[in-house]
From Swiss-Prot, chains A, B:
NCBIfam families tied to this protein: PQQ_syn_pqqB
Family label: Belongs to the PqqB family.
Organism: Gluconacetobacter diazotrophicus (strain ATCC 49037 / DSM 5601 / CCUG 37298 / CIP 103539 / LMG 7603 / PAl5)
Source organism superkingdom: Bacteria
GO biological process assignments: pyrroloquinoline quinone biosynthetic process
Protein name per Swiss-Prot or TrEMBL: Coenzyme PQQ synthesis protein B
HAMAP family: PQQ_syn_PqqB (MF_00653)
Pfam families: Lactamase_B_2
Pathway: Cofactor biosynthesis; pyrroloquinoline quinone biosynthesis
Keywords: PQQ biosynthesis, Transport
Described purpose of this protein according to its UniProt entry: May be involved in the transport of PQQ or its precursor to the periplasm.
Phosphoprotein is among the record's keywords: no
């Protein structure tokens, strides 16, 4: 069994974004049922429905745990069903929630070496005592059997793999700070119980041949739903950057996500990490219809998929 | 006018704390009306009811803004009524929320040099572009007239002053890591519109003569309500540290906060930064009665005081 809960479906900033007065964010603030609020992207995954691994620690993690009974402590005075945290990148919206998980609670922190380097470079993350929360490097393309803090197998094996992406904004430097790289700075995650195969890829700058081959025939794929069109933030007047500049391919258009997945025979396709500028967030948008007709679901906070 | 909104009333970890299964946290999770949830300590203060300064950027800041209509954007596509953020320390629970305020939105970040040094030492805070969010050092005991980002006076003057405290846990080092110091690492904040005098002191290791003199006759004081008794976390089996070890004086007992304020003639006294182990959080606790009878209010998320 792969049991999966969407803790947050939105991209960095969430929906609504704190400083956005754009129409969609106003609808979310007004509790419009067609524009439900979404926190920042994260999932929890379990092989037994009892012990969970949080994939990406969003800034909203404290609220996300509060809203998710499966993640509430159940034993003793201090405990957690969260056995570990896996990071697919070092962006603010994937690591900030680690600061919520202090309080001397054992769990395992798993990330690739470039992401662990980013944490090492920020002493604030020493709030997680390394003797209690070990930092375990993940090697690209090496299957890694998840275990509970006591060593018991968790029933899931993950395989991290590099996807095209960019370094976090706060770590940009050098002559080409926005270069798209594929070095493990941004990863996708394959998850399997030995039978089913699920993927979590919240950020991806472009589809590649090897990625296409990897995903073909998968049972479940969560994929980068940041932007509907590459220039939507510019056109809406809410930002200066294209999706490509931010390291995200767009959902629509030639070479977009819908296009790229058309012949991949993935059983269940779910968009996640959806920016507040993306009309997919609105249940009554024509873009939502287009995505649905192409076989895509739009994730929402609390969505649960068991496969 | 000093207009003040409590964004969060709880100490670090909030109430309920993510990994606490103690009875009080279970009551909060069960929506017991006598144990309402509280987010991590922060206030917003305004001299005109329209432009706000957030004092301490808690990890819950995104949710706190969402719950506070006064802090919602009102103009254009991107804007905020938040003119600045003032930090009284460099703890995880006072700085993490800065990472929520990215998105190229101008405001001013004000803190003492030791706290700015802690931010400087953590490149993740470069997510706030210094050309858009200037970092302004506050000098101890120097009145500082708050201004809006366009330079307009905000109608409030703050004076930061050192209070006994300790360095953040993640920055502890040396032979006496928990030493109580009074060097500006932890500050209190005096706030005035020229007529009224309010104070915000969410962490204080002990009452001193100069602090007593400063607070005498104040209109409003928010004060460290972390623990009811110094050893309550040890006795409850939920922690190894006393309040003194964490840099917080306790509310009750000889030399405690109630005792220390007994003859200070403060018009309105409000406890804030209340730990989830503190029975003051429970409306039906005898300790709450004792505090009320001594003239203290217990702050809650959304509490608004205009003085």
């Amino acid at each position: 069994m792969i049991d999966l809960i969407v803790l947050g479906a939105a991209a960095g900033g969430g929906f609504p974004q704190w400083n956005s007065n754009a129409p969609a964010c106003r609808r979310a603030r007004a509790d419009d049922p067609a524009a439900p609020s979404r926190t920042q992207a994260s999932i929890a995954v379990s092989g037994d429905g009892a012990h969970w691994f949080v994939v990406n620690a969003s800034p909203d993690l404290r609220a996300q745990i509060g809203q998710t009974p499966a993640l509430h402590p159940r034993h003793g005075l201090r405990s957690t069903p969260i056995a570990g945290v896996i990071l697919t990148g070092g962006e603010v919206d994937t690591v900030t929630g680690l600061l919520t998980l202090r309080e001397r609670q054992p769990f395992t922190l798993l990330a690739t070496p470039p992401v662990l380097d980013l944490l090492d470079a920020n002493p604030i993350f020493e709030a997680l005592d390394r003797s209690i929360v070990p930092r375990v490097p993940l090697a690209l393309d090496q299957p890694f059997a998840l275990a509970l803090p006591d060593g018991t197998p968790a029933g899931l094996t993950i395989t991290p793999f590099a996807v095209p992406g960019k370094v976090p904004l706060y770590a940009e430097s050098g002559p080409d700070p926005a270069a798209i790289v594929e070095n493990g700075e941004t990863i996708g995650l394959a998850m399997t119980d030995g039978v089913r195969h699920a993927y979590f890829i919240p950020g991806c700058a472009r589809m590649t041949g090897p990625l296409r081959a990897r995903l073909r025939g998968a049972d479940l794929v969560f994929f980068d739903g940041t932007l509907w069109t590459d220039d939507e933030m510019l056109r809406a007047g809410v930002g200066q950057k294209t999706g490509q500049r931010m390291g995200h391919m767009s959902v629509s258009g030639d070479g977009g996500t819908i296009d790229a997945f058309a012949d991949l025979d993935v059983r269940r396709k779910v968009l996640i990490h959806i920016n507040n500028s993306n009309p997919l967030l609105l249940a009554d948008s024509p873009e939502r219809q287009v995505a649905h007709q192409a076989g895509w679901e739009v994730s929402f906070d609390g969505m649960r998929i068991t496969t």
